[in-house]
Each structure stands twice: as structure tokens, then as C-alpha cells.
């Protein structure tokens, strides 16, 4: 049965308590319960006023039954109507008597709540030291508190809990808000909320400015810091109604909405809509949360300044008020200052004093020199002031000497559209010019939902992760540990990551995810030669992630790599500047089809190297060209999961260390290093009664008696030419055995150095020469 939206809503009138459960949306009328949209444990209430399926949630807002279906299923109004129509087709039209009864029931509930409010208010006492207000920073604030117990909203309220009386527009007490010591809040069952408020009267700016705040603690904070009148709306849902009423009562007042800054953006949107309705302004706190959160974090003076900064109108451009004569009479430095003011003092110059950047929407964007020069020329033209290219260049060059110098972005910050995440402590902050962010992830950081998992809430990332790990849980944990190392910038673990595998196995996605976690500003690409060269190392300073793509052809001892990952100071010799020594505190991530080959036998590389192999090559038809973009949109979930999973960072470190000597890593090293592969054919004996070391001059060779002879035979049998000298073989042997978990022992005898090593049985079939001569056997 096809129905339009209006007809569906009309047909559903009075039936929502049956319709919603039929769609899988469980609701209980007039009970605080988990929100079916955001998952909040007790912030949702279904009141079904006038049979319209009405509801409200402190986080999601309010609406009717159709709006709830839209939000739960994430569909358009027409699609929501189709879902509702599918279960209402057989229902009879709503009986007008039922609707009238619902209205009467609502009126009766309001009257009962108002009467109960009067009764409870008569049993309150005025006092100080309320536990909730003390926690909010106001231990000396006089307030109304319960003198006995009361049951409301599924909560047992105790003596001493805070009571906030709510009045309608006629000044009549119609409801109460009860607030416990731990911050639980309820109003009386069936009581009026929309259009009600509690007012904190102030003396300052009386009749000139009026504040509206969401919660009581926020209102108390604003009132305390400004001395001005503040109305308490209780929630963002009531802001619009209260703002309209305030404008009717106070037509000449400036109305300011002291809104909450929510991660979801809901508080900001509701406040903006209310401000539009009353021609008011919105004042957002400098933290995520409310103005009381800012007060408790930064103190009174800083928060008072932030409040007045938030309502200060934007400064006019001096070019709107100056005359041509005034501007022309100015010195070059004065003209540069006026231009700086025109741009809202949101300009900075790079460390070299050449490139200008402008702060916009959370990031410092580089201004192309020619474009900026044309903009400055446009300001001259606006005033009809004479100019030349030389004059414009002179003003721009002078401006570069006046404005602040751009700093490097903090390594611990990851930028999102709606703020920055501090990866050291997991806190999320609003954007600030002082963060010096140059790029942002083009997604919003979102609040967690109950039961959040990677599999459900980051499906694209999960598919990549599970495929890269071959479906093995322990391998997934290792990959996540590597990503956490990048996220937390744990260069101090003295490890470096090497991801290997065939083309199309997901290695590049690993590098892209690592870049997102480190932040685009904090990541750079290089070659391993860059790490080894003092001249080229200058390009690596200031980054927290160094990517080394496609390094498999490189072969060397990795001295620079060892020094950087070991936390040693390395020499840097930049062009046209004096050489110096510095630490490069960065995580190094190499991405190769084949593992790198190191000639170092001291163990300096092996004890820092973590190899993660992606064995499966994804078929071309299965590859998703949009995978990176999809994972980018899931970044907030990924970050939360990593920080929660590795709340003890040492768990991630131990996983990476266990990966170093895993069978997978050993097999990769064996494929890359023939000497290391040969060591895999050795096993230890309880005593030093095994093979002798031998040397190259002993003739004839005895491959079962002399270890060095066996090594030469292995290299020859497999066609390898570059064999190690006896000395280098002897030096590297203990280190390589240790990677296999074997202890090397030796003793000096008359026949030479005897070891505790012997050849494994598989040596005879794989490469050991077959000879019937017992002297060579």
C-alpha cells in the first residue's frame, strides 16, 4: 500500500505505541530508557503527546514518531513513511475520541506534576554545600535541597539532592528538576518542560543583555562570571521555545545562548536555530562540553575572558572606515599592520620568513604569493590609493617581519573537521590557531556509542585488517599494535616496522592508515639512503612518521637506521647552514614487496626490526578503489579502539616484540638472508660436543664435522656467491642463533673450537653434498 508522508502520519495517529515495536524500536511510554538512536542509557523518553509518537532525548533532540523512525534507520522522511505504512496498512484510522483522551491525559499529567512540584517545594530547605554544586565549583552557593526521600523517573532521590524549580511564562511553578550528587537529572513525570525555565536574576546589564543556558551548572557559571541574568532551559530541546518567549518578553535585550559544544554538533545546531528565532548570538565554550567544564578546567578569569570574547562582534576591517588620505599618509609598517588587521590577525609566516599562511576553519593554509599580492593590491584599489608592484611588494615584505612566525604542529595532535585529538591523553579539543595544524582529516570525530566495535562500526577497516591478518586474531592484534605505535608516536620503543608482501596485498593501505593516525602534517616519505646521509637527514626533522616505500633493492648495514631508532643523536648537515647533531623522534615504517637486506651482523638491526607480512594478493576485481576514503571516515572509531585496547601501551610493545621472533618473521628473514637461512638448519646439543668451527684452509672439506664447511656447502648448493669470511661468520653466529631462540656455546680444544651445534636432519635432503667417501662424509 503506497502512501505519502502526510497521509502516513495521519493514519499512524494514536497507533505509535504499536507501530514502533513492530519496526523493532522498543519504547515505554513516560519512562526514561535507553535511546534507540544514540544508545544513551537513560536519556530518552517517549511521551506520545496527542498520539503523535512524540519523544525527546538529551543528545538527539526531539520529534514525532516519523522522525524517530528516520533517525533510527538513517533514512529520508519518504522512506520512513514507507516503513511505517507497511505496518499500518491494516490499522483503522485514529479515533478522535482517543486523540482527545490523549490530550486530556497530558493536561491531567501536567496538573498532577505541578501539584507535586508545589508539595515537594514546601518540603525543601535552603542551604549551601550541595554535593553536586560543590563538584561543579560552587560549594558556597545557596540552593534548594530535598529534606527527605522521593521516587521519580526511576530514581530514588535522597535528602540533600538539588531541586531546581521550573516556571512557565506566567511565572507559575509547573515542574521541578531534581539533580543527584553524581549528576543524574529528572523532571517530574508528565510535567511541562517545553517553554519552562528557571531564572538566575542578575544586576549587571539588567534590561540590556539576557543569557539562556542549557543546564543549571552552565547557567550558574555564566551568572557567577558575568553577574547578568541567565535563564535555564534544561536541555537543547527547550532552547528554541525559550528563546522565542524571551524575545517576546524582552524585545530590546541582547539575547545570548550559552550553548554546549557537543561532539555530535547537536547542541550547536539547536543553539543556532534558537539564535535565529530570537535574533540572538551563540557563545560556545573553548572546550567540548559546557561553560562549567571550561570553568573547572581553566578557572574563573580565563573563562570570563572567553565568555566575553565569544560574544564580541567581529572586528570591522580598517579598510571599511579609512580614507584614501589616511592610508596614503601611513608608513609602510602601518600599512602592513592595517592589512594584518583586515585579515583578522590570522596570518603567520613560515620559519624561513617567506611563505604566508592564513588560519581558516582549523588549519593554516598557505597563501600563494601572487594571489596574496593581488589581494593587497585590491585593498589599495578599494580606497582608490595609488600603488605599484614595488609598493605592494614592500608592504608584503614588511608584513612578514611583523606577523607571528608559524610553529611546527604538535606531534601528538590529529586534526579532524570538528577539533583535534590529543593522542597522549585521549582528549578532544576545539580548533585553535595555536595548534598550528596544516591539514585535517575530512571527517568529524564522533562520540563513542554503546557496544562500539571495529567489525560493526568500522567495517571497511575491519575487512582490510582481517584480510591482511589472514583471519587470525593474533595477527590482527600485531597489526593494531603497530598502528598504535604510530598513533602514540612511540619512537622510544626503539623498534622500526617493515611491512612486506606481494603487490596488492594491502601494504599501501597500511601506510595510508598510519599517515592518517600520525597526521598528514607529521608524516613524510623518504628512502633509506635519506636516513644514512647527514645531508639528506635535514628533511626528516620535525616529523613523527617516516615512510620508506619500496626499499627491497637496498642492501647495507643500516647504521643511520639503527642510530635513529635507537634514540641516538645523529649528525645533520643542511645546505647553507652549519652541521649539528639532533635526535629524530620518529616511527619508521618501511613498505616493501620483499624484505630489506642488511649486512649488519651485530644484532643492532635485528633487535629493532619488526616484520609484518601480508601474504595474500587481493584479486583485481575484489579491490576497492574507495577503500582509503571509507577508512578515513571511520578514523574516529579506529582511534578510540586503539587507545582503549592499548590503554596499557606495554601490551602493544610486547606484541611487537613477540612478532620479531615469530615463525612468520623468521621465514621472511630466511628468504631475504641466505646466512640467516643456513642458521635455521642448526640445532643445539646439551653439551659442547657438536661440530667444530673449522676454517677454509682445511682440506678436504668435511661438511658434517666443520660448521664453516657446512656453511660454504650451503652457499654453493644454492648458488650464492657473496659468502661471509670466517671472522664475520663467527661474529654473527651468536646473534642469529639468538633470533631462533638458541644459545650458542663453544670451547677450545686441540682440534679447534668445538660448538654445541649440529645439523638438522633436513640438511641432508635439502643441500648437504652426498658422497660415499667417508673422509668427506
Swiss-Prot record:
EC number: 2.7.7.-, 3.6.4.12
Residue stretches spanning the membrane: none
Annotated ranges, domain SF3 helicase: 474-627
GO cellular component: DNA-directed RNA polymerase complex
Binding residues for ATP: 501-508
ZnF endpoints (CHC2-type): 35-60
Disulphide bonds in the chain: none
GO process annotations (BP): DNA replication, synthesis of primer
CDD domains, per the entry: TOPRIM_primases (cd01029)
Keywords, alphabetical: ATP-binding, DNA replication, DNA-binding, DNA-directed RNA polymerase, Helicase, Hydrolase, Metal-binding, Nucleotide-binding, Nucleotidyltransferase, Primosome, Transcription, Transferase, Zinc, Zinc-finger
Gene3D superfamilies linked to this entry: 3.40.1360.10, P-loop containing nucleotide triphosphate hydrolases, Winged helix-like DNA-binding domain superfamily/Winged helix DNA-binding domain, Zinc finger, CHC2-type domain
Reaction(s) catalysed by this chain's protein: ATP + H2O = ADP + phosphate + H(+)
InterPro entries: DNA_primase/NTPase_C, DNA_primase_Znf_CHC2, Helicase_SF3_DNA-vir, NrS-1_pol-like_helicase, P-loop_NTPase, Phage/plasmid_primase_P4_C, Phage_T7_Gp4_N, TOPRIM_DnaG/twinkle
Coiled-coil regions listed: none
Record domain Toprim: where: 208-296
Pfam families: D5_N, DUF5906, Pox_D5, Toprim_3, Zn_Ribbon_Prim
GO function terms (MF aspect): ATP binding; ATP hydrolysis activity; DNA binding; DNA-directed RNA polymerase activity; helicase activity; zinc ion binding
Subunit comment: Homohexamer.
Function of the molecule: This protein acts as a DNA primase generating di- to pentaribonucleotides; the predominant product being the dimer pppApG. It complexes specifically to the P4 origin of replication (ori) and its cis replication region (crr). It also acts as a DNA helicase.
This protein's name: Putative P4-specific DNA primase
Originating organism: Enterobacteria phage P4 (Bacteriophage P4)
